[in-house]
A protein has these predicted regions:
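N-terminal intrinsically disordered, cationic/polar leader segments
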Residues: 13-194
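N-terminal amphipathic/basic-hydrophobic helices that include classical n-h-c signal peptides
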Residues: 1-13
Length: 194
């Protein structure tokens, strides 16, 4: 008896994110097609497969996410899917963006059609294809990546940074805007300081 009431108590107090209704702004359409959440807006269309342990109810100007089971998995997915749905709605209205900086003497980047071309101190240029759904802009040594899908923007930004991670001695490489790279002393500098 106590265990049953404890389970109910846990499910009722679970997921502050999942419990909140999600506002659907004007000009945005949210629907469930087969087993997919489909969100359409001025910035495009996003789709995500809906897990069978989760239910999404769409009303006129709001949506809600609820778990269909009293399992640990469904409780975990409850907040996750609510966050995904919020991000999808935001993304089709206002694109997500990430900025990166290319640092280092002789290091540069240029936009060539649907590719980013980097000179990063290697014997060959590094070329990255810009994925569909992503927009890239280059201003001197700053790259701006934007798109409706928050995860896709983050993944592509991480791929760019991974082509030449900032090194800890001089800080050369590609870093996120505002990222602080903790610098190490070289052996000569450390010996001189001693």
């Amino acid at each position: 008896m106590r265990f049953g009431s404890l389970a109910v108590l846990t499910i009722n107090h679970m997921s502050r994110i999942g419990k909140r209704a999600i506002t659907i702004p004007a000009g945005t359409e949210v629907s469930i097609v087969s087993n997919e959440i489909v969100v359409k807006g001025k910035g495009g269309t996003l789709k995500r497969v809906l897990h069978p342990a989760i239910k999404v109810v769409v009303l006129k100007d709001e949506a809600s996410v609820t778990p269909l089971e009293r399992s640990r998995l469904s409780r975990a997915l409850w907040g996750t899917y609510a966050a995904h749905l919020r991000n999808m709605i935001q993304g089709v209205n206002t694109p997500f963006a990430k900025k990166l900086q290319v640092e280092g003497i002789g290091f540069k980047v240029e936009l060539a059609g649907k590719q980013l071309k980097f000179a990063l101190g290697f014997s060959h240029p590094v070329i990255l294809n810009i994925p569909a759904g992503i927009t890239a802009a280059v201003d001197k040594n700053v790259i701006t990546i934007s798109g409706a899908d928050k995860e896709q923007v983050g993944e592509f930004a991480a791929t760019i940074r991974g082509s030449k991670k900032p090194e800890p001695y001089k800080g050369k490489g590609i870093r996120y805007e505002g990222e602080v790279v903790r610098k190490k002393q070289g052996k000569k500098a450390a010996a001189a300081a001693a």
